[in-house]
């Protein structure tokens, strides 16, 4: 697996700890939107030190094939993080994993999420030979539900009490992409 992929004027790139400031800007700018659908973060999450340590750990995990987070950049906006897509929960015997993604609030409804996830699916199915890729989505996240459906994900029902959000356990819809 490579650390950088280019397509249609875009780049998906793994970042190391030297990009902690840029990644922190991306997360901080989108904190309110991202926190609606993500589990609680540690108190020190929004610090350069925490982000740097996370990027270093994620880089090492990619080398082992356990996890990967790629950040989305556009040729038109060099240096600006537009989104991220990650894979995790890799089960090699079943050739399966889960996928997560997010787009900067300033670049939504432009097709970037679909483009980013589409290319990550190609990478996962061709390079990592994943057969089954799951996405768990909060029922109120209609944009995300529409995104996965447009890319051929199939609904498998509800994962009850799947993630603790804002102090309470929340159901999520489970979708699967079969290569």
Model regions and ranges:
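Conserved GNAT-fold acetyl-CoA-binding loop/helix
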Residues: 35-56
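Generic alpha-helical scaffold signal
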Residues: 17, 28, 45-49, 66
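A short helix-loop-beta-strand connector motif used in the catalytic cores of GNAT acetyltransferases and
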Residues: 43, 56-71
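Acyl-donor (CoA/ACP) binding surface of acyl/acetyltransferases
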Residues: 1-22, 26-33, 73-179
């Amino acid at each position: 697996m490579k650390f950088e992929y280019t397509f249609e004027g875009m780049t998906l790139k793994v970042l190391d700890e030297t990009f902690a400031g840029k990644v922190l800007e991306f997360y901080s700018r989108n904190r309110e939107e991202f926190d609606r659908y993500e589990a609680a973060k540690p108190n020190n999450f929004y610090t350069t030190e925490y982000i740097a340590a996370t990027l270093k750990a994620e880089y090492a995990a990619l080398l082992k094939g356990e996890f990967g987070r790629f950040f989305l950049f556009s040729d038109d906006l060099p240096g600006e993080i537009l989104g991220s897509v990650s894979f995790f929960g890799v089960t090699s015997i079943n050739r399966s994993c889960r996928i997560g993604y997010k787009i900067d609030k300033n670049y939504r409804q432009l097709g970037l999420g679909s483009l980013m996830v589409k290319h990550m699916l190609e990478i996962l199915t061709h390079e990592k030979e994943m057969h089954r890729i799951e996405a768990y989505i909060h029922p109120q996240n209609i944009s995300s539900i529409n995104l996965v459906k447009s890319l051929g994900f199939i609904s498998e029902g509800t994962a009850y009490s799947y993630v603790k959000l804002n102090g309470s356990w929340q159901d999520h819809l489970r979708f699967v992409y079969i290569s």
